[in-house]
Design a protein with these regions (language model features):
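Short, intrinsically disordered, charge-balanced linker/junction segments flanking boundaries
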Residues: 180-182
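Conserved DEDDh/DEDDy metal-dependent 3′-5′ exonuclease domain
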Residues: 2-25, 30-177
Length: 182
């Protein structure tokens, strides 16, 4: 897992990510329950087979609107890169809105699978991860923590990088289930 803060580090990573085919993404937002939410982190995984976190990049973009704009321009609007989110509608509020291209949402994928095939009480990422991928001990308590303070706690950073790994595994299982039902 790489935690990147400087514009140069993030810019370098964007150049690398532009060459990829699929990215699994998540965001953490400071002040999410106010009128002025602020994008704090962009988490990116570029290898769905990675369960260790070595291919996860955490981009600390709090108060760096210029690098967020660059990420949107180079990654989010780039239609040749598939971008996978859970609840993409929320993340896209901060990452290009309707300009974003080639976006896949695992929440929407799960909802389209008939209930008799995927009988779940809800389609939260945690539920999908436990039921489809047999993940254990998924702690979501840091989801609503204060993403606007620095430095972030080790627990916040761990939560942030695990979400991408979980997302990629859930996406993979949903693709398998979808192919079986077609």
């Amino acid at each position: 897992m790489s935690y990147l803060k400087s514009v140069d580090e993030i810019r370098s990573l964007i150049a690398k990510l532009k060459k990829g085919n699929t990215l699994w993404l998540d965001t953490e937002v400071a002040d999410y329950d106010t009128r002025n939410p602020r994008l704090s982190l962009i988490q990116v995984l570029d290898d769905c087979k990675d369960l260790t976190g070595e291919s996860v990049y955490i981009l600390d973009v709090l108060e760096q609107p210029e690098i967020v704009a660059e990420f949107i321009e180079e990654i989010m609007i780039n239609s040749s890169i598939e971008k996978v989110f859970h609840n993409a509608k929320y993340d896209l509020r901060f990452l290009g809105k309707k300009k974003a291209q080639n976006v896949i949402c695992t929440l929407e994928m799960a909802k389209k699978i008939p209930y008799y095939i995927l009988p779940l009480p809800n389609y939260q990422l945690k539920t999908l991860a436990i039921e489809l991928c047999h993940f254990q001990d998924i702690d979501k308590q840091h989801q609503s923590s204060d993403w606007g303070i620095r430095p972030l706690s080790e627990e916040q950073i761990e939560y942030a990088y695990l979400d991408c790994i979980i997302l990629a595994q859930v996406h993979s299982r949903l693709l398998e289930i979808t192919q079986q039902t077609d």
